């Protein structure tokens, strides 16, 4: 694996820089490469700490809580606070989405059941009308 292979994609780094800086700002190739190297190193540093924690706990998957823990352990409290808030919001949104989907499925089934009942009722009424008509015309 070459050094370039381990770096974040330069296009993504440049796009993020453009989003953060004023629209009239110019970004040199050297600036993009420097941020690319720093951001890659930062991510590796934090991920390595989180990965070591997982290894000690005999786990193979690094999760958001591990990243939060690593940031806190490394003394990067501002980042840890931001990640903690993000994790909380993410989990809340997931919980709401799950509840909404569960509610939609339940009400969807209820609607389907109601529709079936309505069709059956309409069919029964139609049959009665037809039977009445038949018996009336038979007289």
From Swiss-Prot:
Tissue specificity remark: Expressed in flowers, siliques and young rosettes.
Residue ranges, compositional bias (Polar residues): 116-125
Renumbered residue ranges of the record's region Subunit association domain (SAD): 35-46
Swiss-Prot/TrEMBL keywords: Activator, DNA-binding, Nucleus, Transcription, Transcription regulation
One annotated Gene Ontology cellular component of this protein: CCAAT-binding factor complex
A GO molecular-function annotation: DNA-binding transcription factor activity
Compositionally biased region (Basic and acidic residues): 90-115
Pfam annotation, one family: CBFD_NFYB_HMF
Alphabetical GO biological process terms: regulation of DNA-templated transcription
Record's subcellular location: Nucleus
Coiled coil: none
Region Disordered: start-end pairs: 90-139
Residue ranges of DNA binding: 8-14
InterPro entries registered for this protein in UniProt: CBFA_NFYB_domain, Histone-fold, Transc_fact_NFYB/HAP3, Transcrpt_fac_NFYB/HAP3_CS
Similarity comment: Belongs to the NFYB/HAP3 subunit family.
Function statement: Component of the NF-Y/HAP transcription factor complex. The NF-Y complex stimulates the transcription of various genes by recognizing and binding to a CCAAT motif in promoters.
Assembly and binders: Heterotrimeric transcription factor composed of three components, NF-YA, NF-YB and NF-YC. NF-YB and NF-YC must interact and dimerize for NF-YA association and DNA binding.
UniProt-recorded name of the protein: Nuclear transcription factor Y subunit B-4
